From Swiss-Prot:
Swiss-Prot/TrEMBL keywords: Developmental protein, Disulfide bond, G-protein coupled receptor, Glycoprotein, Membrane, Receptor, Signal, Transducer, Transmembrane, Transmembrane helix, Wnt signaling pathway
Cytoplasmic topological intervals: 259-270, 343-359, 415-442, 510-581
Record-stated family: Belongs to the G-protein coupled receptor Fz/Smo family.
Superkingdom, taxonomy of origin: Eukaryota
Protein name: Frizzled-3
Role, per record: Receptor for Wnt proteins. Most of frizzled receptors are coupled to the beta-catenin canonical signaling pathway, which leads to the activation of disheveled proteins, inhibition of GSK-3 kinase, nuclear accumulation of beta-catenin and activation of Wnt target genes. A second signaling pathway involving PKC and calcium fluxes has been seen for some family members, but it is not yet clear if it represents a distinct pathway or if it can be integrated in the canonical pathway, as PKC seems to be required for Wnt-mediated inactivation of GSK-3 kinase.
Length: 581
């Protein structure tokens, strides 16, 4: 019944009295405007469009002389309108700021006194006291026109007020020349439908009818539908703090890599790109928290976008999803390459130069395939906005590939660790034996510190519960707000994701790094490269303590190449002439 959802504008005329003397009018009259000099203009503010008329004239009851001032005022009244205290609240507030204007009427037409008193009484009864403080001071019901006094005004007949927000009577008008415009109640009370053909859909508070399924209700944009405001504040604080720490530590690691690139050759070079991925990953989170919130407040103040019945996918949201998903998979790919390089160095005796020759292949494998999952999610239309974090998500499209990459990396990590232990056991207690043990401990510790939190974050993401909609209500009494979802899975996911990224910067944390920065900052004597110091220290030791080329170094007495690839912070623990590759 399309006619059941029509908004009725009742214009009461004082034909002889007002036309003769224009006395007794308390409505908004354009200053200096005569009966034939009224300047009508289209209503340009989206929040007050669809009232049943589309032309207005200024100044209004608040004294605004342009629509921008009125738009800023209506944006401040959004919480009161969206509270659902009265289904007529939107019409009353908008008509007070954008009165009706038509060439057939000599002055702008405001709402009637009875309508104002009805809406104010309903809101006083249903709205919280803090929301009633938003009631505009310029909207004095006693000063509005009254039909009983033959004053021109707009009134919604009381007999159309039926449960469900659907008027029961046919559209009527009390004035000539004013057309009947059908209008749903979707902006009048919380939970109305977003489209005119769904006007009969009843939804809980902070929900609106789905334009795709008339039996479902979707969350309204920027409202507390599935999560409370405290949950959102907690997640925002957590993301902001961890992202800042992750950005600083990974940036420090990147600067260290850049300052001394010769210290970090293969097989440890993939850590550089692992840090780069998480540095950019933290930047994405920081951008969404800092700039997105500012843009959201700007939209509320200037455009009233909170009046939208539902949250749609926006280009910034999609961009954040593609970027974070891509960087997550790139990081998992570089973790796999990192473990693979150590495996090839320790088990297959690949040299650093051999791994360097295949760096191009590593880059292709790490940067190109991760594009597929987020693009597939977009093509399959599986991306949804997240109410809790304000970012977009597509469950399973990133988590499952990342989990596979992490498990493959764990396999090569275990194989590499076993090979390192076997090689270490072949050495007698010498300087090389001690340094080799340090390499293995550092490799295993770093792998554990990265794999554990990152895998925990992926598992938490798989366990996270998402909700897109709720069933529509059959009667107003059944429209109860759903129980808020738990925010713990999302908070755990965010925590472990950013902690895992932060710990990637630990690879450069060593005494050599401290000495290098101290020398560069001129804190001790003449600045000297730590690389030169290491070379001098290595030259002062006998070669038999640095290379494993003699029979006395092996328990079996055989001459075997022990290690061909790892040069941990320039500790020379292998003989390049013994490389098989």
């Amino acid at each position: 019944m399309y006619a059941a959802s029509i908004l009725i504008l009742h214009l009461t005329w004082a034909v002889a009295t007002i036309a003769a003397n224009g006395a007794g009018h308390n409505g908004p009259v354009a200053s200096g405007a005569g009966p034939n000099g009224l300047q009508c203009q289209p209503i340009a503010v989206s929040a007050c469009q669809g009232l049943g008329y589309n032309m207005t004239a200024l100044p209004n009851l608040a004294g605004h002389t342009n629509q921008l001032e009125a738009e800023l005022q209506i944006a401040k009244l959004v919480p009161l309108i969206e509270s659902g205290c009265s289904r007529r609240a939107r019409f009353l507030l908008c008509s007070s700021l954008f009165p009706l204007c038509t060439p057939d009427v000599p002055r702008p037409v405001a709402a009637c006194k009875l309508l104002c008193e009805t809406v104010r009484g309903e809101c006083m009864e249903n709205a919280p006291p803090e929301l009633m403080e938003l009631w505009p001071s310029f909207l004095n019901c006693d000063g509005l026109p009254q039909p009983e006094k033959h004053e021109l005004c707009m009134q919604i007949p009381q007999e159309v007020a039926v449960p469900g927000g659907s008027p029961s009577g046919p559209p009527t008008t009390g004035s000539p020349g004013v057309e009947d415009h059908p209008q749903t109640y979707r902006f009048w009370k919380s939970g109305a439908s977003p489209t005119s053909d769904l006007a009969g859909v009843l939804c809980p508070q902070n929900f609106s009818g789905s334009p795709f399924n008339p039996e479902e209700c979707v969350p309204q944009c920027q409202r507390d539908a599935f999560h409370t405001s405290s949950q959102k504040k907690t997640s925002e604080t957590l993301i902001l703090g961890l992202s800042a720490v992750c950005f600083v530590l990974t940036l420090f690691a990147l600067v260290t890599f850049w300052a001394e690139p010769t210290r970090f050759g293969y097989p440890e070079r993939p850590v550089l790109f692992l840090c780069l991925c998480y540095n950019l990953f933290s930047v994405c989170y920081l951008e969404r928290i800092v700039f997105h919130n500012q843009a959201r407040m700007h939209d509320v103040e200037l455009q009233g976008r909170l009046m939208r019945p539902g949250c749609l996918l926006t280009p910034p949201c999609l961009a954040s999803y593609i970027t974070t998903s891509y960087l997550s998979l790139c990081a998992a790919s570089w973790w796999l390459i990192f473990a693979l390089c150590f495996y090839l160095s320790s088990h297959k005796k690949w040299s650093s130069e051999a791994l360097e020759k295949r760096s191009g292949l590593f880059h292709v494998l790490a940067w190109v395939p991760p594009l597929a999952p987020p693009i597939a999610a977009l093509l399959l239309e599986k991306v949804r906005p997240s109410e809790l974090t304000g970012m977009c998500y597509a469950p399973g499209f990133v988590e499952l590939p990342a989990l596979v990459l992490l498990l493959l990396g764990l396999y090569f990590t275990l194989r590499a660790s076993r090979s390192l232990l076997s090689l270490q056991q072949q050495l007698q207690p010498t300087l090389a034996h001690h340094r080799f043990g340090q390499i293995r401990k550092r490799f295993v510790l770093f792998s554990l510190l990265y794999f554990a939190p990152t895998t925990a974050g992926v598992v938490a993401a798989l366990c996270e519960r998402y909700a897109d909609s709720v069933p529509s209500c059959s009667t107003p009494d059944d429209c109860l707000s759903p129980t808020p979802l738990s925010a713990w899975p999302a908070l755990v996911r965010i925590f472990f994701q950013l902690v895992g990224g932060t710990l990637t910067g630990l690879w450069v944390w060593s005494r050599k790094t401290c000495e290098s920065y101290r020398n560069r900052l001129g804190a001790s004597g003449t600045p000297t490269s730590s690389l030169m110091n290491q070379s001098k220290a290595a030259g002062a030791l006998p070669k038999k303590h640095l290379y494993t080329s003699g029979k006395s170094m092996l328990p079996t007495g055989g001459i075997t190449p022990l290690y061909a690839g790892i040069s941990f912070h320039n500790v020379p623990v292998y003989n390049p002439n013994q490389s098989r590759v």
